[in-house]
């Protein structure tokens, strides 16, 4: 599945909004001519909308997600790899056990998020430090294997072992912290 996020180009894409159980808000991306973008939102605890678009169908080991993205200072465009999507009574889709593969000014972080006692808790699995320029477009990808992740961006490649990797999962893009733009997204399966 390849999606161009330009205006009018992704209206029928098999994507759905989904949200972490960490947050109550359910914002959507704003449309710009050549991309989608999250917005400043003073009502949100971080001051910006935290928005995720997920593929509607689950994937298995061998699947990869890639995107062209950019971010303003302190932004954090990321991939979400969610074990399950839960339909809440209000119809909203949410996820609680998931991985975040985050691109930001100081490199790449990977976080494992787990729902415990009704709260999402997290642990950092990877902190690879290198400069990533805000305001520029970056190609970013993550392949899910049976035992972890292979991440590529900015001419660098990282292989990360992830204990108890999900046998099936949902993939998506998410805008977190500050302003983030996604120009395209592709999900491939082996």
Feature-to-residue mapping (PLM):
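Low-complexity, Ser/Thr/Pro/Gly-rich disordered linker/stalk regions
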Residues: 1-63, 148
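Short tryptophan-centered beta-strand motifs in secreted/extracellular beta-sheet-rich domains
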Residues: 65-67, 135-145, 149-151
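Generic beta-strand structural signal
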Residues: 30-31, 103-104, 144-146
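Secretory/extracellular carbohydrate-interaction modules
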Residues: 40-114
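Flexible glycan-contacting loops in extracellular carbohydrate-active proteins
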Residues: 160-184
């Amino acid at each position: 599945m390849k999606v161009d996020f330009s205006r009018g180009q992704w209206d029928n894409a098999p994507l759905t909004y989904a949200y972490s159980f960490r947050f109550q808000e359910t914002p959507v991306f704003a449309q710009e001519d050549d991309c989608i973008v999250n917005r400043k939102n003073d009502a949100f605890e971080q001051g910006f909308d935290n928005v995720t678009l997920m593929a509607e169908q689950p994937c298995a080991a061998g699947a990869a997600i890639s995107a062209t993205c950019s971010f303003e200072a302190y932004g954090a465009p990321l991939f979400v790899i969610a074990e399950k999507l839960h339909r809440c009574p209000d119809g909203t889709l949410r996820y609680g056990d998931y991985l975040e593969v985050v691109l930001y000014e100081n490199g790449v972080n990977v976080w494992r998020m787990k729902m415990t006692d009704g709260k999402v808790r997290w642990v950092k699995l990877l902190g690879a430090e290198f400069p990533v320029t805000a305001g520029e477009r970056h190609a970013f990808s993550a392949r899910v294997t049976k035992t972890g992740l292979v991440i590529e961006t900015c001419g660098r490649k990282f292989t990360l072992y992830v204990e108890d990797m999900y046998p099936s999962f949902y993939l998506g893009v998410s805008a977190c912290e500050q302003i983030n733009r996604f120009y395209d997204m592709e999900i491939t399966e082996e």
